[in-house]
């Protein structure tokens, strides 16, 4: 029986490491990403560096006050039937809740600072490579690593993934979530 994600209390780094290592057994992965809940849907902005994630979180807070930043650091993506839900990593954000009320995942954007903002859809193979590169994988457990790869593959085939080069400003938000606030 796979582990449940419902009652999580992480008090040490070792607890967090065990939690991240157990995610693939539950069909979930941890991703270095800023997560935003916009119109009851999660939008993830994945980046290796924390600076662009923080920049995006700041833009959401400034220009889309009705949206909620779930986390600037790491998000958990887990399956619910044929869809995925996203919630803040409880190791990073004490309020991260894996409950059934966490928002469904609408898109994953792999973000890069740039002088001009552009959005480019990714083929599944490129999205899979990026998702794995920016995930917390359960090394050195080979079986759980295979489960993580399989989960990531399902995610990129069901959730739109893009490369998002962005210049900080309102335009980047208009591209990924047109304003109607």
List each language-model region with its residue ranges.
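Charged, amphipathic alpha-helical linker segments immediately N-terminal to NTP-binding catalytic cores
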Residues: 1-21, 158, 174-181
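Glycine-rich, often acidic-flanked micro-motifs
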Residues: 32-34, 38-48, 61-181
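Conserved glycine(s) of the Walker
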Residues: 51-53
């Amino acid at each position: 029986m796979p582990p449940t994600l419902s009652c999580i209390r992480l008090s040490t780094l070792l607890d967090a490491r065990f939690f991240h290592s157990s995610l693939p057994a539950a069909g979930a992965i941890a991703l270095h990403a800023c997560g935003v809940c916009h119109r009851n849907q999660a939008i993830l902005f994945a980046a290796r560096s924390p600076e662009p994630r923080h920049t995006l979180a700041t833009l959401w807070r400034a220009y889309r006050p009705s949206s909620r930043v779930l986390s600037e650091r790491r998000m958990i993506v887990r399956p619910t039937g044929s869809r995925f839900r996203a919630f803040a990593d409880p190791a990073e954000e004490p309020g991260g809740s894996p409950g059934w009320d966490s928002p469904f995942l609408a898109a994953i954007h792999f973000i890069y600072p740039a002088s001009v903002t552009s959005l480019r859809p990714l083929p599944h193979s490129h999205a899979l490579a990026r998702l794995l590169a920016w995930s917390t994988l359960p090394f050195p457990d080979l079986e759980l690593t295979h489960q993580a790869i399989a989960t990531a593959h399902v995610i990129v085939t069901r959730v739109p993934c893009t490369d998002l080069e962005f210049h900080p400003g309102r335009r980047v938000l208009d591209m990924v979530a047109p304003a109607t606030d």
